[in-house]
């Protein structure tokens, strides 16, 4: 009974972690199109689009795509954005 009560309280407070949704196929396609417009490198853009699926979630994919289009990540996303760029470069540009 106590466990049920604690679960209800945590749900009400919004403190139970939820699993974020993976990026969508449409986001992956948009990422690839935007990347190709910048880099004109199929191997790199294909790799980065694929890597993004395992490195970031659906919300953050929008942050990345907006940044690729010239936007800046919000302050709260800045560290995560830099981490994403570093990890995707490790995967797709190992000698970078």
Q: Which residues are covered by each model-predicted region?
A:
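Post-signal/leader-peptide non-cytosolic segments of secretory proteins
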Residues: 20-95
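Classic N-terminal secretory signal peptides
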Residues: 1-20
């Amino acid at each position: 009974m106590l466990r049920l009560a604690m679960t209800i309280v945590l749900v009400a407070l919004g403190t139970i972690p939820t699993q974020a949704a993976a990026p969508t196929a449409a986001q992956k396609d948009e990422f690839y199109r935007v990347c190709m417009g910048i880099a004109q490198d199929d191997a790199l853009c294909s790799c980065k689009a694929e890597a993004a699926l395992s490195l970031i979630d659906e919300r953050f994919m929008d942050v990345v795509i907006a940044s690729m289009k010239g936007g800046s990540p919000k302050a709260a996303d800045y560290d995560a954005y830099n981490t994403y760029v570093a990890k995707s470069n490790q995967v797709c540009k190992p000698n970078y």
